[in-house]
Design a protein with these regions (language model features):
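C-terminal catalytic "cap/lid" subdomain
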Residues: 1-235
Length: 235
């Protein structure tokens, strides 16, 4: 019998929440919300980090001050987390948003002990505001939260079904990698996460990272159950 992980951190891209140029696709948002509710209902403890790519991307900033641009991205993650909290609650689950940027009238200030307690209570915990600091990506933020929450597994939902030897959208000979260590992925410059995130993965010895495709939201349940492999990264 497959043993399911007890505590999971999931990274979703902001683009997964939008479609055809829209910031938000309500049908997709509710589908993802229902899946997250279902994951929590299995007894797994679930934390989620969401990017802000549907709202704001750094490359849009042009000549803008870099710190200001990063703050805008952090605020975009708050909007996305509030949206998904609502979706989880509308589909029968319980959820809470913790923000690394204090805004107590909107969401809970981030605190490690409070977030762990909320996960233990069966709530889907959304981590907003990135790491709370500019110049760090949501890749780094999700690894940081995985370490702080003592996660058994980190899931990275992508627009492709795993890690490839090259960009499969550009190279027809690109091959899916099923299993690879953190060190080898970094050495081969495979664009899974940024170097700061990889360094933290290695230092904190996060037990396992699974990279999978989010073509269907149900893939979240499948990868947790072990029915969808994608790519497994490990120390």
């Amino acid at each position: 019998m497959k043993e399911s992980p007890k505590r999971i951190l999931l990274k979703l891209s902001g683009e997964a929440l939008g479609e055809n140029g829209r910031l938000f696709d309500q049908d997709m948002i509710l589908r993802v919300g229902k899946i997250l509710s279902d994951v929590a209902a299995t007894g797994a403890q679930l934390g989620v980090v969401i990017g802000a790519g549907n709202i704001w991307r750094g490359r849009q900033s042009q000549e803008m001050d870099a710190v200001t641009a990063d703050h805008m991205g952090m605020l975009g993650t708050v909007i996305n987390c509030l949206c998904m909290r609502d979706a989880v609650e509308r589909t029968g689950g319980h959820a809470v948003v913790f923000s690394a940027i204090d805004m107590p009238r909107v969401c809970e200030p981030y605190n490690v002990q409070s977030a762990r307690q909320a996960m233990a209570e069966g709530k889907v915990v959304f981590f907003a505001g990135g790491s709370g600091n500019p110049f760090f990506t949501t890749d780094t933020a999700v690894v940081l939260r995985a370490a702080e929450m003592q996660a058994d597994m980190l899931l990275l939902a992508k627009n492709v079904d795993g890690v490839y030897t090259a960009d499969p959208n550009k190279d027809p000979n690109a091959q899916l990698i099923h299993d690879i260590s953190y060190a080898e992925a970094l050495e081969r410059c495979l664009r899974v996460m940024d170097t700061a995130a990889f360094a933290m993965l290695t230092e904190q010895a996060i037990p396992m990272v699974r990279v999978f495709g989010l073509a269907e939201p149900e893939n979240i349940l499948k990868v947790i159950a072990g029915d969808l492999r994608g790519t497994v990264l490990h120390p």
